[in-house]
UniProtKB/Swiss-Prot annotation:
Similarity field: Belongs to the histidinol dehydrogenase family.
Gene3D superfamilies in the record: 1.20.5.1300, Nitrogenase molybdenum iron protein domain (3.40.50.1980)
Binding annotation for NAD(+): 129, 193, 218
Taxonomic lineage of the native organism: Bacteria, Bacillati, Actinomycetota, Actinomycetes, Mycobacteriales
Protein name: Histidinol dehydrogenase
Positions with a binding annotation for substrate: 241, 263, 266, 333, 366, 420, 425
Species whose genome carries this gene: Corynebacterium efficiens (strain DSM 44549 / YS-314 / AJ 12310 / JCM 11189 / NBRC 100395)
Known role: Catalyzes the sequential NAD-dependent oxidations of L-histidinol to L-histidinaldehyde and then to L-histidine.
Length: 451
């Protein structure tokens, strides 16, 4: 089922690897002309425009953008106890990890009386996007809200598409997760129009704009984020989900097959890639996939994803080359199924998250490992990171020098200012220690304004 790319027999360069690797991705640029008018319309008409687009795309118009408190409470009250237990345990684990991520204020002394203190200040108002679509994602509520809460964010807003099956409100499980987390501002709006409304708000509807928007979404959500970036902050652009598995002949082919299948279940564009130095493992995994995928509930979706150009098996000469291939692929999720898996994992430079060994599968990270599942995709893990407490914090420096400390460094500053031909910078320093000459304006030729 999976296509095979054979890199054996030579040492591939980085360029060779990037050209050879299966990669799908999404062409965000192609949908910008579709999304830009939506964003502009919501900026101009606010909530009314967002509701109009919801009616057009989601085939339902909620009674209001903001979900009433009683609807949130009812969703929590009627939640299946087993689902509630799962949500609460996942919140506990994710909160523990993200609480430990919060950096501490620190001060550096440059000279007696001269210090720089770095403080970490939370963003004031955050918009969290939770998609609808093929599945229900209360886990995305947890993964976005908990790090923001641990950062000390002032206000959280969750936006999620209205659903005709649920009275025009977002899915009840999403609403229940919001209620359990204490998020009481939830908007029944999805897609590009949700991103625009979060960015621009609507004073007439008492919908305040946010300062940053995070959370996954489809290509239209991603395009809208690109258009509003600069008006607000955003997290990294999320393409279709992906898994890479680096494995040798010690790997269990059944487990590897199931992990590839489970990621393909998300989306027909999802990518599932096996990187291995074992031709036997490659054959075994392909056989296990063929034998098992059809019994899953989402078999058609899985099959399309696994047969797509974005998925495949990459054969390499050895694990050394496998590590290089994994680094160039820079997977959203990377599993390592090798002898000495921890040692191999520590040599990986590029991945959104690394899952070490046979008992740390990606589905654990999707829900309850404690790590965050909002991760960079499409190779962007080479230069960006997943969502964390840091996403919602701004480092701010406090510079504090006394007179002696400034005088001690003043000559350096003045010389630098002169080198850059910015003499007023130097004079701003000198004026604190000496009386600088002034120019008295000659008013003899100035017209008398009262004449």
């Amino acid at each position: 089922m999976l296509n095979v790319t054979d890199l054996r027999g030579h040492t591939p360069s980085k360029s060779d690897i990037r050209r050879a690797l299966p990669r799908g991705g999404t062409d965000v640029v192609s949908v910008l002309p579709i999304v830009e008018p939506v964003v502009d319309d919501v900026q101009n008409r606010g909530a009314e425009a967002a509701l109009d687009y919801g009616e057009k795309f989601d085939h339902i118009r909620p009674a209001s953008v903001r979900v009433p408190a009683e609807v949130l409470k009812a969703a929590e009250d009627t939640l299946d106890p087993r689902v509630r237990e799962a949500i609460e345990e996942s919140i506990r684990r994710v909160r523990k990890v993200h609480a430990d991520q919060k950096p501490r204020e620190h001060t550096t002394e440059l000279a007696p009386g001269g210090t720089v203190t770095e403080r970490f200040l939370p963003i004031d108002r955050v918009g969290l996007y939770v998609p609808g679509g093929n599945a229900v994602y209360p886990s995305s509520v947890i993964m976005n809200a908990v790090p923001a809460q641990e950062a000390g964010v002032g206000t959280l807003v969750v936006a999620s598409p209205p659903q005709a099956d649920h009275g025009g409100w977002p899915h009840p499980t999403i609403l229940a997760a919001c209620s359990i987390l204490g998020v009481d501002e939830v908007w029944a709006v999805g897609g590009a129009q949700a991103v625009a409304l979060l960015a621009f708000g609507d004073d007439s509807a008492d919908l305040e704009p946010v300062d940053i928007i995070t959370g996954p979404g489809n290509i239209f959500v991603t395009a809208a984020k690109r258009l509003v970036r600069g008006v607000v902050g955003t997290d990294s652009e999320a393409g279709p989900t992906e898994i890479a598995i680096l494995a040798d002949d010690t790997a269990n082919p059944v487990n590897v097959a199931y992990d590839l299948i489970s990621q393909a279940e998300h989306d027909v564009m999802a990518a599932s890639v096996l990187i291995t130095d074992s031709e036997q493992l490659a054959r075994d995994v392909n056989r296990e996939i063929e034998a098992r995928y059809a019994i899953t509930r989402n078999a058609d979706r899985v099959a399309e994803a696994l047969r797509g150009k974005q998925s495949g098996i990459v054969l390499v000469d050895d694990i050394e080359v496998g590590i290089a291939v994994a680094d160039q692929y820079a997977a959203e999720h990377l599993e390592v199924h090798t002898a000495n898996a921890r040692e191999v994992s520590e040599r990986i430079s590029n991945a959104g998250a690394i899952f070490v060994g046979d008992f740390s599968p990606v589905p654990l990270g999707d829900y309850s490992a404690g790590s965050n599942h909002v991760l960079p995709t499409s190779g962007t893990a080479r230069f960006s990171a997943g969502l964390s407490t840091h996403t919602f914090l701004r480092p701010v420096n406090l510079i504090e020098y006394d007179e002696a400390a400034l005088k001690d460094i003043s000559e350096v500053v003045i010389n630098f200012a002169d080198a850059e031909d910015l003499p007023a910078h130097g004079e701003a320093i000198r004026a604190r220690f000496e009386t600088l000459p002034t120019t008295t304006a000659d008013t003899t030729d100035t017209p008398d304004a009262t004449a």
